[in-house]
Amino acid sequence: MGLRDSLKEREDRRSSEEEGDARQSWMTRESTTGWRKESTAALGTPVADWQCVLLLQFGALQQKLLKAFPRAGPRPTTTLVPARPERARKKPHSQPPPSTHMALQAQATASPSPSPSPTRGRTGSGEWPDDAEKLPIAATASPARSSDAVELVVVASTRHAAAAKYVPRRSTSHTADPNPGRGGGGGSAGWYSWNGGRTRTAAPPRHARADPPPAPPRRQQPVEAPPPPPPPPPPPAPAPALPPPVPPSPPAPAQAPVPPSATAPAPAPVPAPRASSPHVQFRSADQVVPNILSRKRRAAAMQRTALLARGAAAGLCLAALAVLAADTRKGWARDSYSNYTQFRYSEAVNVIGFIYSVFQFVALVELMRRNKHLIPHPKRDLFDFTMDQVLTYLLISSSSSATARVSDLIDNWGSDPFPSMANGSIAISFLAFAVFAICSLISAYNLFRRDV
C-alpha cells in the first residue's frame, strides 16, 4: 500500500507540474501578445516579441531580488510604461526606434506584506510559473505616491545589452516624460535614453543659407626655371712628387737665399668645359639635305655599276657557251663536247647565267627609266642576292670540272683543236665568274644597307 501511494503521489505531482508548465507557457504567450498589442497601439509601430519577453523577464528578476533582499517600508509594484507615446505620435521622425525606448518604471506603493514574487519552474526553463500575474499597462492617470517613493527607470536595450539607472523623482506623473505639461504637445524634457538620461529636444530647423558665389579661379603664375648650377670648381693640381732621399754629403758652403720670385709658378686652373652653342644643332640640321642628296647619288652610281656588270656577265656567258657549242667534230679524233659530262655541265651553266643576266639587265633599265622594277622591292633584293650567289658557285664549279677534263685529254692524247677550244670556253667562264662575284657584292649591299 505504501509503494502504491508513493507512486500515485509521484504521478499526481508530475501531472500538476506538467499542468503548471502548460499554464505558465500560456500565460507567457498571452502576456507577450497583450504587451505587443498595447505597445503597438501606443507607439504606432510594431514591437518585437523579444522586447516584451525581455521586459517581463526583467520584472520577474526584480521580484526575485526584492524577495531575496527585502527592504523596510512599502514594497514597490512594477508598472510597464511605453516611453512618451504622445511625442511618438506627433513627431515620428525625431524619435529613435521603438526597440530602444521601452521603459520599465517601478513605483513604491503601500502594501502590508510582501506578496510572493513569481519564480521559475523547477524544470529550469525561462517561463513564468502558474501564479505569475499579468503585468498591467500604465494608464494616463495613476494613484498618488507616498513621500518616500522613488522612481526606478529601466531602459530596455537592443538585443545585445541592457542598462539601468536611478533617476530621482521629478513629478507625480507615471509616464516616461517627467515634464508632461511643458512646451505643449506632451512635454519638452525629452526621451529617456539607454543610460537613463534624457535626450535634448531637437532644435528648430534653420533656414538654409544661400551658397556664396564661387570664387573666380586664380591665375596660375608661370613657374620660373631655376638658374643653371655653377660650373664645378677645377680639380686641385696634384702635389709634386718628392725626390728620392739623397745620402748625406759633407757640408757645403752656405749659399745665398733664393729670392721668392725664383720659385716654381703655381699651376694654372683647368678651364671649365664650354656649353655647346645652339648653332651647332642647326649645323647638324643643315647637313640633312646634303646627306640625302649624296645618298641618292650613291644609289644611282650603284645602279649604273650593276647595269654594267649585268651586261658584262651576259656577254661573257654568251661567248663561253658559243665557243663550247662550236667545239664539235674537232681534232684528229673528230671528237665533240657532247661526249663529255663536264663540258655539258659547263654549257648548261653558261646558258642559265646568260638568261639570268639578260633578265637583270632589262629590269635595271626599266628601273632607271620608269622608276619601277619588275619584282616588288621587299623581295627583289633577296632574289638578286640568292641568284647571284648560286650562279657564282655553279660557274666556278663547272669551270673547275671542265679544266680537269681538258688537262686529262691533253695528257693522254696530246694537244689538238678540240681541247684548245674547250680551254678558251673555260677561260671565258672564269671571267664570267668574276663578274658574277661583283654582282653578288652589289646585291648584298642593296639587301643589307640601312639608308633605304
From Swiss-Prot:
Residues 1-305, 369-389, 445-452 are cytoplasmic. Residues 25-34 have a biased composition (Polar residues). Coiled coil: none annotated. Residues 327-347, 407-423 are extracellular. It is a multi-pass membrane protein. Residues 1-39, 71-147, 164-283 are annotated as: Disordered. Glycans are attached at residues 339, 423. It is found in: Cell membrane. Residues 1-17 have a biased composition (Basic and acidic residues). Residues 211-272 have a biased composition (Pro residues). Residues 105-126, 190-205 have a biased composition (Low complexity). Homodimer and heterodimers. This is CASP-like protein 4A1. It comes from Sorghum bicolor.
